[in-house]
C-alpha cells in the first residue's frame, strides 16, 4: 500500500507514493482484567507505540526512519497465602520497554505497471530496560519482615532486518503479492542483574 508505512517489511518503502512524505504516530492502550479467589481487578494503561517518517527517494527507491517498540512489559498483581501462623503476601511486578530506533532503505530492480520486485533493509539501534520483581511480606508480623527478588535486563545493541516484496498483476482485477521479512539470528549486547534483598521492612 503506497499510503501506509509498513516498517515490519522494509522492502515496502520503494512502493510509497511519489512526492508525499508519510508520517505515522501510534499509541497503545491496554485493558486488563484479573481475578483470583473471588477478588477481581481492572486496570488500563496507555503508552507510546511508534513514530515513523517515510518518503519516496527515486522512482525505484524509498527511505524510512523512526522509533518503534521491540518489547513492552507492564504488569502487577499480588496474592496472599495463609501459612497456618501468619499470612504471606506475594507481589509480582514487571515494567519497562525496549525501543527500536531504525532507518531503512528499499530498492526495486523491477518496477513496471504489471510487476514489481523490491528488496529492503532496516538498520536499527535497540535500547532500554525491563525489570521483573517478586516481593514477599508477612502481613500480621509487627515488623513486616519480607524479601525482594529483582531481575533487571538492560539492552544496548545494533540490529538489522531484511525484507523482500514481489507483486504481479494478472488482467485488470487479479494481483499476486508475496512478501517476506527476515530477522536473522543476532547477538545483542546487554546485561542481566539478579538481586536479592531481605529486610525487616521492605516498602
Regions found by a protein language model. Give the residues of each.
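Outer-membrane beta-barrel porins/channels
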Residues: 1, 60-203
Amino acid at each position: 500500500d503506497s499510503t501506509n508505512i509498513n516498517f515490519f517489511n522494509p522492502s515496502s518503502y520503494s512502493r510509497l507514493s511519489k512526492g508525499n512524505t508519510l508520517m505515522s504516530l501510534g499509541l497503545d492502550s491496554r485493558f486488563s482484567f484479573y481475578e483470583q479467589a473471588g477478588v477481581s481487578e481492572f486496570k488500563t494503561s496507555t503508552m507510546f507505540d511508534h513514530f515513523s517518517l517515510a518518503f519516496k527517494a527515486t522512482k525505484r527507491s524509498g527511505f524510512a526512519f523512526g522509533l518503534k517498540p521491540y518489547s513492552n512489559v507492564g504488569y502487577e498483581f499480588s496474592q496472599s497465602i495463609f501459612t497456618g501462623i501468619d499470612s504471606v503476601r506475594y507481589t509480582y511486578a514487571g515494567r519497562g520497554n525496549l525501543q527500536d530506533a531504525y532507518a531503512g532503505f528499499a530498492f526495486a530492480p523491477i518496477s513496471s505497471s504489471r510487476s514489481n520486485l523490491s528488496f529492503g533493509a532496516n538498520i536499527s539501534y535497540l535500547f532500554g530496560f525491563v525489570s521483573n520483581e517478586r516481593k514477599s511480606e508477612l502481613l500480621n508480623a509487627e515488623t513486616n519482615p519480607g524479601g525482594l527478588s529483582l531481575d533487571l535486563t538492560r539492552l544496548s545493541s545494533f540490529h538489522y532486518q531484511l525484507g523482500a516484496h514481489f507483486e504481479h498483476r494478472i488482467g485488470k482485477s487479479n494481483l499476486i503479492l508475496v512478501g517476506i521479512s527476515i530477522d536473522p539470528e543476532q547477538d545483542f549486547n546487554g546485561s542481566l542483574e539478579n538481586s536479592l534483598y531481605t529486610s525487616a521492612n521492605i516498602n
